[in-house]
């Protein structure tokens, strides 16, 4: 068997916020809540698969609880999540060959004010930059689940997949920056896991616009020129076509 995730040091336990709820008595297990929902890709002697469940936890500090009760949820910065990742394992023995984490140190990016296709993000970039030093480790809890199997271009030796929302999902104050490589279409070298390129559909996502559907590979003709393309149906309601 291939073990994808080791239990986190800090996880759900008897001190969890809702552990005393009679409706879920004895349901607190200590599980991280992380798993894989997509079929793995078997390619060139490797099993390639991503993890999910890293972008939706209720990430609250114990200090935010008052008298054992939680008075509010919206507006709190997050912790106790983890980066999502795509990983390759040796198909013969399960040994991990490479891992690409979807959030990394430096995930703040360029603090862009528009998407790559020109839609204003209406971000307070000045405030985000001022807060960045305070949240320098936010990428360690950054989310970026992978909800589908990757597409493979055997001619180029590349795989393509989309990533989920950053964590915490709808609260961006604790994660300044573009939150690379969440909500992105990502291309990796299949043999090494090295990043070749990415296209971030929504930087600093606040709305849960996961790149959740599987990419499709095809050729497209533009002005008489045939271009190898990768297409992806997005949650923003557009179908994106990128040059592979």
Regions found by a protein language model. Give the residues of each.
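Noncatalytic, solvent-exposed loop/strand surfaces
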Residues: 1-244
